[in-house]
Curated annotation (Swiss-Prot):
Spans annotated as Disordered: 1-24, 236-261
Catalytic activity reported: uridine + ATP = UMP + ADP + H(+); cytidine + ATP = CMP + ADP + H(+)
Gene3D superfamilies in alphabetical order: P-loop containing nucleotide triphosphate hydrolases
Stated name of the protein: Uridine-cytidine kinase 2
Entry keyword annotation includes Nucleotide-binding: yes
Record text on subunit structure and interactions: Homotetramer.
SUPFAM superfamilies: P-loop containing nucleoside triphosphate hydrolases
Function: Phosphorylates uridine and cytidine to uridine monophosphate and cytidine monophosphate. Does not phosphorylate deoxyribonucleosides or purine ribonucleosides. Can use ATP or GTP as a phosphate donor. Can also phosphorylate cytidine and uridine nucleoside analogs such as 6-azauridine, 5-fluorouridine, 4-thiouridine, 5-bromouridine, N(4)-acetylcytidine, N(4)-benzoylcytidine, 5-fluorocytidine, 2-thiocytidine, 5-methylcytidine, and N(4)-anisoylcytidine.
Gene Ontology MF terms: ATP binding; cytidine kinase activity; identical protein binding; uridine kinase activity
BP-aspect Gene Ontology terms: cellular response to oxygen levels; CTP salvage; feeding behavior; response to axon injury; UMP salvage
Gene Ontology, cellular component aspect: cytoplasm; cytosol
Pathway: Pyrimidine metabolism; CTP biosynthesis via salvage pathway; CTP from cytidine: step 1/3; Pyrimidine metabolism; UMP biosynthesis via salvage pathway; UMP from uridine: step 1/1
Amino acid sequence: MAGDSEQTLQNHQQPNGGEPFLIGVSGGTASGKSSVCAKIVQLLGQNEVDYRQKQVVILSQDSFYRVLTSEQKAKALKGQFNFDHPDAFDNELILKTLKEITEGKTVQIPVYDFVSHSRKEETVTVYPADVVLFEGILAFYSQEVRDLFQMKLFVDTDADTRLSRRVLRDISERGRDLEQILSQYITFVKPAFEEFCLPTKKYADVIIPRGADNLVAINLIVQHIQDILNGGPSKRQTNGCLNGYTPSRKRQASESSSRPH
């Protein structure tokens, strides 16, 4: 399928007169959001494309953590700062950046250092693309941001799986110890998921149980994106229906999967 997708993307004209198609991807911590996005990009044949010419790009909400004060940074280094709260993100910059993307502008994305809990001086340049995937635990929390997405995906993975993934990730990639990870999870991550992330699941057009392992759902999404890129009949028709999947069928599929809590 990847080969066919790559050929399709190479031949298409930019949809809707150049306006990019924004897709929001939400879900709990370590639910597989970035893996789902990476799988979509892979199946669309974009992995080997030069970054200046990519037609599908991924942005992460994690890049937009606020610059912390000295006091906040000291708490963060002890695992006592809540990075899962909406106020932890620079929401004004997120909104400004996404609006500029919808206008077809080249944007500069911050780079966040999860070891030192600080924003680096360098930025990443993102050039105009046809499809932009924006993933994050609170991607749907702000209505202003949420309303910019033409398609909204929620990655629904059970709590035990998410916790085990987070432990492995934070130890190997972020230099944390197990005690700190578990304390932070119980104190901040789990309560924030239940209060801020899980309630936004209702805004999703498509719910993806089991994340990147759910190839059936991902292939349907890829097919829909291909239709959008080619200006097909399903272009921008995502609210309530995706390739024949109605809202009621969507909910039934999500209810049959494991709930996070």
